[in-house]
């Protein structure tokens, strides 16, 4: 039996706990969240810890799942590692490369597993795209273009996710696409340039994050990527487009469908595990449930069908690793800290680029 403790049991943390508990040989034993732990503890038959220290030092915990707000990941990860606990941490791992480095180093020094919650890697369509690329089907990857944008209306209250100091803004909080591009390109770019600003969401009823950002990445061997995020787009889009020397792949997460284009012919594949899940995601994007290209959850709310399925898949993989299964090559970077470090390093370089109005080399961040 592998015993799990969860730090942060709001919307996403509670769902991670629920789906981990479904696995044979997995038990959620201890929860820590001063505001939200009681209800999910009662549901799962777990105990509530009175402090973070109580949870990470407990003999009833083998692995700690960290799902606090983004700016509060560092302390539980490092304390868990220092107590010899394996760690799963939600994305973004940290809001600075230095913090991320300290978290990864703490896990290495204490010889514990550290898994980054970069959940997009568990999408069926992303896995299939990686397979096609590795098999040389579309030739050499020359260029990637991602967009994750929509229009955000005023909300009853300002979520922590809209406060840059707490979430990191779109760049860090929605780091999935950046991470995905770096997986597809084989690592970090050599240089980045970021521009953007808050063009339509200023005032007391909104947070302080930029609602339009644009990132240009330059990789080795004349390869490029363009990424855009934001909540000031009346024409919403969400996709990853991969241009190769022989063909192209489009992962459309708005009108949910994967497309392979070769020799002028198109073939299609699922983004998620079933047509029902793809249709569920398409329906949500075209309904009023989305806001600014993201459905912001809140404690007590359940994830939609497509997201529940991929959480289930991610938690099942984590549990298999905890039970001693070998780490697959595809996900190796998620369990060495490399994916976490590369994603945050690039995000930091982008942030520096915008504030200093210049192109930034990744070597300035990763020294």
UniProtKB/Swiss-Prot annotation:
GO terms for molecular function: nucleotide binding; oxidoreductase activity. The keyword Oxidoreductase applies. It holds the Pfam family GFO_IDH_MocA_C. Keywords: Oxidoreductase. InterPro entries: Gfo/Idh/MocA-like_OxRdtase_C (IPR004104), Gfo/Idh/MocA-like_OxRdtase_N (IPR000683), Gfo/Idh/MocA_Oxidoreductases (IPR051450), NAD(P)-bd_dom_sf (IPR036291). Its EC number is 1.-.-.-. Belongs to the Gfo/Idh/MocA family. This is Uncharacterized oxidoreductase SP_1686. It comes from Streptococcus pneumoniae serotype 4 (strain ATCC BAA-334 / TIGR4). The lineage of its organism: Bacteria, Bacillati, Bacillota, Bacilli, Lactobacillales.
């Amino acid at each position: 039996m592998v015993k799990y403790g969860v730090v942060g049991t709001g919307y996403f943390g509670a769902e991670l706990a629920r789906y981990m508990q479904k696995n044979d040989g997995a038990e959620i034993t201890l929860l820590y969240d001063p505001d939200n732990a009681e209800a999910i503890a009662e549901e799962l038959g777990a105990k509530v810890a009175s402090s973070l220290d109580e949870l990470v030092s407990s003999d009833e915990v083998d692995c700690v799942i960290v799902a606090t707000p983004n700016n509060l990941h560092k302390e539980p990860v490092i304390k868990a590692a220092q107590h010899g606990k394996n760690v799963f941490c939600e994305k973004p791992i940290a809001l600075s490369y230095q913090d991320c480095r300290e978290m990864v180093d703490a896990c290495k020094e204490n010889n514990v597993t550290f898994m980054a919650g970069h959940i997009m890697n568990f999408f069926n369509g992303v896995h299939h795209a990686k397979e096609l690329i590795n098999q040389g089907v579309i030739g050499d990857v020359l260029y990637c273009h991602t967009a994750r944008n929509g229009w955000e209306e005023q909300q009853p209250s300002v979520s922590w996710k809209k406060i840059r100091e707490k979430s990191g803004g779109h760049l860090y909080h929605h780091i999935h696409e950046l991470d995905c591009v770096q997986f597809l390109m084989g690592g970090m770019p050599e240089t980045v340039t970021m521009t953007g600003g808050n063009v339509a969401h200023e005032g007391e009823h909104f947070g302080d994050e930029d609602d339009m950002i644009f990132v240009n990445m330059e990789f080795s061997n004349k390869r490029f990527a363009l990424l855009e995020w934001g909540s000031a787009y009346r024409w919403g889009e969400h996709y990853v487009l991969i241009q190769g020397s022989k063909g192209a792949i489009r992962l459309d997460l708005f009108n949910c469908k994967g497309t392979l284009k070769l020799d002028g012919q198109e073939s299609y594949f699922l983004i998620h595990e079933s047509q029902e899940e793809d249709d569920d995601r398409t329906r949500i994007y075209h309904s009023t449930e989305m806001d600014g290209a993201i459905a912001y959850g809140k404690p007590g709310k359940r994830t939609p069908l497509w997201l529940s399925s991929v959480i289930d898949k991610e938690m099942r993989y984590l549990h298999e690793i905890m039970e001693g299964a070998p780490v697959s090559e595809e996900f190796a970077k998620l369990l060495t800290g490399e994916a976490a470090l590369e994603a945050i390093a690039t995000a930091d370089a982008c942030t520096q680029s915008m504030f200093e109005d210049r192109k930034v080399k990744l070597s300035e961040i990763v020294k």
